[in-house]
Amino acid sequence: MFDENSNAAGTTPVASSLAATPNANLMSQVFNVKDSRWLQVEVCREFLRGQCARSDQECKFAHPPPNVDVQQGRVTACYDSIKGRCTRENPKCKYLHPPQHIKDQLLINGRNHLALKNLLSAQINQGGNQMINPMLALQQQAAAVNLLPNTQMYPQYYNGMMYQQVLPDPYAAAAQQLQTAALLGNVGGLLSAQSAAAALVANSSTQPPTPSPLLRLQRKRALEEDTSNGNDRTAAAHTQLLSLAAGAVPVKRPALDKNGAMLFSPAAPQTPQFNPYLLQTLQGYVPTVSCEYMQPPPF
């Protein structure tokens, strides 16, 4: 059975052990101050008017005697009367001696009040410990994190739910490797083309500057001289030099977006521009038109 005095005695050591905490004053107020709100009972309004036809054993509201103080339509029950030990007769007790059905309801209210008080004290005690030992809480949290395994944890699979991809995509990895290899190959080809062009330029600089046979052939008119007997070997060398010089594009850093992907891949096939000097089959051929006046054939 509920006993307020026994509850106060049982919580005295707890309050004394928490005296060193910053919330000791609040704890003492919670445990030592007696709250009598759970002992209050509503008075029957019809009884106050003198119109209630029920007796005090049948009415669910209180029928207080004249010696009991009524405040705002409510009276306070005698705790000693609930425990069966009230001996006040002269003068009579100023608190209500409730009947049995009201006494049972007051005992239920007392148990609920005690549970609420214990819950409040536990929350205050927990909050005080967190304020006193913040470093201890951080150490405990770090220890709990270290206890976690370093391996990858796979969540439980449920049907009908969409999950984010955890394992890497093999197709994406293969495409990235191919793109990297193509980029490295393109850079190597550009470097080799630049070195070959530099070597040819160095060899040509040692010889005296002479006009190119291909340029001389282009300046001459097609009707005056036949270009089929030209120096094919010299024209082929000159054409190779021009192709190497045209292919030597300076290496630039690839442009990247925010995600790290390349905006323009150097390995992508590029459409070469048309250059009539790079034609191997038609060396030195430039179409010309005669400007001389030609007489019409006689009829």
Swiss-Prot record:
What is the organism lineage in this UniProt record?
Eukaryota, Metazoa, Ecdysozoa, Nematoda, Chromadorea
- Alphabetical UniProt keywords: Metal-binding, Nucleus, Repeat, RNA-binding, Zinc, Zinc-finger
Its name, as the record gives it, is Muscleblind-like protein
Function field: Binds to RNA with repeat sequences CUG and CCUG.
**Start and end residues of each C3H1-type zinc finger?**
38-66, 72-100
Predominant localisation class:
nucleus
What GO cellular component entries does it have? cytoplasm; nucleoplasm
Family the entry assigns:
Belongs to the muscleblind family.
Q: Name one GO molecular function term.
A: RNA binding
| A Pfam family that the UniProt record links to this protein | zf-CCCH_10
**Compartments reported by the entry:** Nucleus
Q: Which GO terms describe its biological process?
A: regulation of RNA splicing
